[in-house]
């Protein structure tokens, strides 16, 4: 929005030309989202406390979590607000990739909001019925994927980028829609499963978003895309603004979500952020890179799948409790130790993922 305004004002003052620089807009996008999140934090927490929107804690969970009962939840609203405002201010409104991310972010946020509302207001511990949650998540994911396929069919938009192989970029055809669906829905649920400890989900989200900001910049730059042997996508550059907004909003939220948390993001935040990371990976053609950089989310999800599968097939559990972060809690690890170690692993995986762009 401000970019368009600056383009009209630059004829009166050349200094407005700075708004056309992607690097400048990426920095101010991060700062804008950060300050909005920090400003909203105390007000949001006070409002949630007044409304008695407190966290519901399972009785069969770790005993250390009982003290979290009643902590304000649905704080993801301030994350989404900060991201959306920052993106609308600093990204080109005409960029279709930006709108794809916003559709998934807001759509999944609404689904998460309904789920949280049923849990904390109606006191329904199950929240939104699972089949309806997956139905609406699927509708959004398939709608966006199908639209992208129609526009980018038989172009680099629908190619699959395979790590370590610079000349292996097969056209996916209709499989593109199916892959995109699983990436978007899967990442949304993966981040949701990871959001079980104070700050555990938000920091890996920040790391992955920061990594994708660098990838988006390279993908939207023809010279760097050719140098790294990745598809050049002319709309990808504006995703830098989206990614830095996620980083800023996430850091602002972490200020209040760090142990011991003053507020939790709830499903409204975790589903939306996960969905956003998923669609960003799809738009950049870096689904494999998401698996590497978002390895913490992948392991958390696999731990649940293995736990459920093992119990149904063998009647035995693999972990003391799933997702796996609860397993380490029950082994006696203090919560901050689990959180920080998962952060360190996440940062390492993002750096490894970025390194794969050059190792081809």
Swiss-Prot record:
Gene Ontology BP annotations: cell division; cell wall organization; peptidoglycan biosynthetic process; regulation of cell shape
InterPro entries: Glycosyl_transferase_4, PNAcMuramoyl-5peptid_Trfase, PNAcMuramoyl-5peptid_Trfase_CS
GO CC entries: plasma membrane
Topological region Cytoplasmic: 47-71, 115-131, 189-198, 257-262, 309-337
Names of the cofactor(s): Mg(2+)
Subcellular location(s) of the protein: Cell inner membrane
Membrane topology per record: Multi-pass membrane protein
Membrane-spanning parts: 26-46, 72-92, 94-114, 132-152, 168-188, 199-219, 236-256, 263-283, 288-308, 338-358
Pathway noted in the entry: Cell wall biogenesis; peptidoglycan biosynthesis
Protein origin, superkingdom: Bacteria
Keywords: Cell cycle, Cell division, Cell inner membrane, Cell membrane, Cell shape, Cell wall biogenesis/degradation, Magnesium, Membrane, Metal-binding, Peptidoglycan synthesis, Transferase, Transmembrane, Transmembrane helix
GO molecular function, one term: metal ion binding
Enzyme class of the recorded protein, top EC level: transferase
Topological domain ranges for the Periplasmic compartment: 1-25, 93, 153-167, 220-235, 284-287, 359-360
E.C. no: 2.7.8.13
Purpose of the protein: Catalyzes the initial step of the lipid cycle reactions in the biosynthesis of the cell wall peptidoglycan: transfers peptidoglycan precursor phospho-MurNAc-pentapeptide from UDP-MurNAc-pentapeptide onto the lipid carrier undecaprenyl phosphate, yielding undecaprenyl-pyrophosphoryl-MurNAc-pentapeptide, known as lipid I.
Family membership noted in the UniProt record: Belongs to the glycosyltransferase 4 family. MraY subfamily.
UniProt cross-references to NCBIfam families, sorted A to Z: mraY
Record protein name field: Phospho-N-acetylmuramoyl-pentapeptide-transferase
Source species: Salmonella paratyphi C (strain RKS4594)
Source lineage: Bacteria, Pseudomonadati, Pseudomonadota, Gammaproteobacteria, Enterobacterales
Gene from which this protein is expressed: mraY
């Amino acid at each position: 929005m401000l970019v368009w305004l600056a383009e009209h004002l630059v004829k009166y003052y050349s200094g407005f030309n700075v708004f056309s620089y992607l690097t400048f807009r990426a920095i101010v996008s991060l700062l804008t989202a950060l300050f909005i999140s920090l400003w909203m934090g105390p007000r949001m927490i006070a409002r949630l406390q007044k409304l008695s929107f407190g966290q519901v804690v399972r009785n069969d969970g770790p005993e250390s979590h009982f003290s979290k009962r009643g902590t304000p939840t649905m704080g993801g609203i301030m994350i989404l607000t900060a991201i959306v405002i920052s993106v609308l201010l600093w990204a080109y409104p005409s960029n279709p990739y930006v709108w794809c991310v916003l559709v998934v972010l807001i759509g999944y946020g609404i689904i998460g909001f309904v789920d949280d509302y049923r849990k904390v207001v109606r006191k329904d511990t199950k929240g939104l019925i699972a089949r309806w949650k997956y139905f609406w998540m699927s509708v959004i994911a398939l709608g966006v994927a199908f639209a992208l396929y129609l526009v980018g069919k038989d172009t680099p938009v629908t190619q699959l980028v395979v790590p370590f192989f610079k000349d292996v970029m097969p056209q996916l055809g209709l499989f593109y829609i199916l892959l995109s669906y699983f990436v978007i829905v899967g990442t949304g649920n993966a981040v949701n499963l990871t959001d079980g400890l104070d700050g555990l989900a938000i920091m890996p989200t920040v790391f992955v978003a920061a990594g994708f900001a660098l990838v988006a910049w390279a993908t939207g730059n023809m010279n760097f895309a050719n140098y790294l042997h990745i598809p050049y996508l002319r709309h990808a550059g504006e995703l830098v603004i989206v990614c830095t907004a996620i980083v800023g909003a996430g850091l602002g939220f972490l200020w209040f979500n760090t142990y011991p948390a003053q507020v939790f993001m709830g499903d409204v935040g975790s589903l939306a952020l996960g969905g956003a990371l998923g669609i960003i990976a799809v738009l950049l053609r870096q689904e494999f890179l998401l698996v590497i950089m978002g390895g913490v989310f992948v392991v958390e999800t696999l731990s649940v799948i293995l736990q459920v599968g093992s119990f149904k097939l063998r009647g035995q559990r693999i972990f003391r409790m799933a997702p796996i972060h609860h397993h380490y809690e029950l082994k006696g690890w203090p919560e901050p130790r689990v959180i920080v170690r998962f952060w360190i692993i996440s940062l390492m995986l993002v750096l490894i993922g970025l390194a794969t762009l050059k190792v081809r």
